[in-house]
Curated annotation (Swiss-Prot):
Entry keyword set: ATP-binding, DNA replication, DNA-binding, Early protein, Helicase, Host nucleus, Hydrolase, Isomerase, Nucleotide-binding, Phosphoprotein
InterPro entries in alphabetical order: Helicase_SF3_DNA-vir, P-loop_NTPase, PPV_DNA_helicase_E1_C, PPV_DNA_helicase_E1_N, PPV_E1_DBD, PPV_E1_DBD_sf, Rep_E1_papillomaV, Znf_lg_T-Ag_D1_dom_sf
Protein name: Replication protein E1
Location within or outside the cell: Host nucleus
Length: 634
């Protein structure tokens, strides 16, 4: 700011000024407002011009007035600049588009200094060295309120020059429109990428994939679409991705956005979307927002044909063995096999794998759809629930008939064949010796128990708590695949129904009420004579009670009220607490391997039937419920 009448630029309103009055009139000079141009200059006004008495006071008053004027000008300039900053720059307190009332008040307040503000604004930008440009662009960031209280940043460009204040309203209106467009573009980014993918590849991305809502769901096959990949990186991607996968199918097409890559990848192990996105982001150097990652439609024939046809063309690069879901749907013989479903094959599978529960049959058989054509046809059927129910019913019928057809010796041999080797029968012998049971006496007792000898087909394991009674009995039931009955269901007429199909049974933790019930109603069970039991929704059945093992904290042979059971049960006493080592592991291991070795070692002492000659055939031939095929001889 040029202060007229001073030597220097001035040091502010608090500094000293050296005032020098120069009156020189020349032709063409502007006449100040306080002079009368037409008045005659007689020189009379110079009389007593200098008053030596009041010169000091007059000078002080003039300096005070000038300092006050400069302070007012400085304050007005600061307010004008502040209003311009609030107009064109970001305000942390409020939005420039939000409060129009404040702008009107500010405009009326600074109307007197409008011309000076415009001139100073234009002169405030630094010169580039080549003079002031005709049009200068000022970029200011505006903060536009969103719909939900958020904010969206955009860039406003306004022209400089003498017409800057005229174009201010129009420029800010354009800024608001551009900000809304930016918001719309950001919210429709996925739709824009989808449209670009369909325009370039001629097929919708959603037609190739099935959507996983969770990013943590794992799958081994994934379809990935990458946008804006560098052409050089896209060319080298087939080499970079090879260590991570067993198969890939890569297509690369270029557009104005760069290269868009479509990949079908089978990884070495199942991965989730988050892991794959991080891996690809590292390999191709693009953000995860420019990726679509979803699993393919494994049961869609058009999808399989698309990858098959593009895989054999020259527009794609493939590596590894083609996934079976593509091969199954593109080869002719597989399509014929998938058209029919045979219930007998499903029943045979359930019987061979000993899967007898309906829910387990449905779950495990559905997992075979990728490798078994009959399972794939099962999934395509609309009668899956009916097939599962029928399969479970038939498999249980076959298993029940197989179990009834086997003797005790054949059943023990059958269970031994399904147990692993490497057991040690001495673990069982050591545990019996630890409980004070003579091993040879136990062998004699166990032999009559397995044969179902009348009045010797029930063994009671008696002892205080924590002596290993239930552990010993449950390990034997697991190996023999026996049935468990519980006295808690004694209120029902059908609580003894599991004994119908059992080779051996267990009644765990019999209380005094249970012994009273046995003494009143089940004496003939312990005698080994045929008896009748009730079955739910079926007629009564007559059977002989299988060998029954009972654990209890009560010794029935010492109770006078249970005198009729004294000769019907054989008691084993477990009086010592079951031992554990310092790590909490059982000292004596009672598992299937040890029981298998126990029966193999004591087979002859238990008087079990010797294994028949293999030349005469297997005593339990493999079961086959699938119809055979006639072989045509040449």
């Amino acid at each position: 700011m040029d202060c007229e009448g001073t030597e220097d630029e001035g040091a502010g309103c608090n500094g000293w000024f050296f005032v020098e009055a120069i009156v020189e009139k020349k032709t063409g000079d502007n006449v100040s407002d306080d002079e009368d141009e037409n008045a005659d200059d007689t020189g009379s006004d110079l009389i007593n011009f200098i008053d030596s008495e009041t010169s000091i006071c007059s000078q002080a008053e003039q300096e005070t007035a000038r300092a006050l004027f400069q302070a007012q000008e400085l304050q007005a300039n600061k307010e004008a600049v502040h209003q311009l900053k609030r107009k064109f720059l970001v305000s942390p307190r409020s939005s420039p588009l939000g409060d129009i009332t404040n702008q009107n008040n500010t405009h009326s307040h600074s109307q007197a200094n409008e011309s000076q503000v415009k001139r100073r604004l234009l002169d405030s930008y630094p010169d580039s060295g080549y003079g002031n440009t005709q049009v200068e662009t000022v970029e200011a960031t505006l903060q536009v309120d969103g719909q939900h209280g958020g904010s969206q940043n955009s860039v406003c460009s306004s022209g400089g020059g003498s017409v800057m204040d005229v174009e201010t309203t129009e420029s800010c209106a354009n800024v608001e429109l551009n900000s809304i467009c930016e918001v719309l573009k950001s919210s429709n980014a996925k739709a824009t990428l989808m449209a670009k993918f369909k325009e370039l590849y001629g097929i919708s991305y959603n037609e190739l994939v099935r959507v996983f809502k969770s990013d943590k769901t794992c799958c081994i096959d994934w379809v990935c679409a990458l946008f804006g990949v560098s052409p050089m990186v896209a060319e080298n991607l087939k080499t970079l991705i090879k260590p991570f996968c067993m198969y890939y199918h890569i297509q690369c097409l270029s557009c104005d956005w760069g290269t868009i890559v479509l990949m079908l990848i089978r990884f070495s192990c199942a991965k989730n979307r988050t892991t794959i996105a991080k891996c690809l982001s590292t390999l191709v150097n693009i953000p995860q927002s420019q990726m679509f990652i979803e699993p393919p439609k494994l049961r869609s024939t058009p999808v399989a044909l698309y990858f098959y046809r593009t895989g054999i063309s020259n527009i794609s690069n493939t590596y590894g063995e083609t996934p079976e879901w593509i091969t199954r749907q593109t080869q002719l013989q597989h399509s014929f096999e998938d058209s029919t479903f045979e219930l007998s094959q499903m029943v045979q599978w359930a019987f061979d794998h000993e899967v007898l529960d309906d829910s387990e049959i449905a779950f495990h058989y559905a997992q075979l759809a990728d490798i078994d054509s009959n399972a794939a046809a099962f999934l395509k059927s609309n009668c899956q629930a009916k097939y599962v129910k029928d399969c479970g019913t038939m498999a249980r019928h076959y298993k029940r008939a197989q179990r009834k057809s086997l003797s005790m010796s054949a059943w023990i041999r059958y269970r031994c064949d399904r147990a692993k080797d490497g057991g040690n029968w001495r673990e069982i012998a050591k545990f019996l010796r630890y409980q004070g049971v003579n091993f040879m006496s136990f062998i004699q007792m166990f032999k009559q128990f397995l044969k179902g000898t009348p009045k010797h087909n029930c063994i009671v394991i008696y002892g205080p708590p924590n002596t290993g009674k239930s552990l010993f009995a449950m390990s034997l039931m697991k190996f023999m695949q026996g049935s468990i009955i519980s006295y808690v269901n004694s209120g029902s007429h059908f609580w003894l129904q599991p004994l119908e199909d059992a080779k051996i049974a267990l009644l765990d933790d019999a209380t005094y009420g249970c012994w009273t019930y046995i003494d009143q109603y089940l004496r003939n069970f312990l005698d080994g004579n045929p008896c009748s039991i009730d079955r739910k929704h079926r007629s009564l059945i007559q059977l002989v009670c299988p060998p029954l093992l009972i654990t209890s904290n009560i010794n029935p042979q010492e109770d006078a009220n249970l005198m009729y059971l004294h000769t019907r049960v054989t008691v084993l006493k477990f009086l010592n607490t079951f031992p554990f080592d310092n790590n909490g592991n059982a000292v004596y291991t009672l598992n299937d391997e040890n029981w298998k070795n126990f029966f193999s070692t004591t087979w002859s002492r238990l008087d079990l039937e010797e294994e028949e000659d293999k030349e005469n055939g297997d005593p339990m031939p493999p079961f086959k419920c699938v119809p055979g095929e006639n072989t045509r001889l040449l």
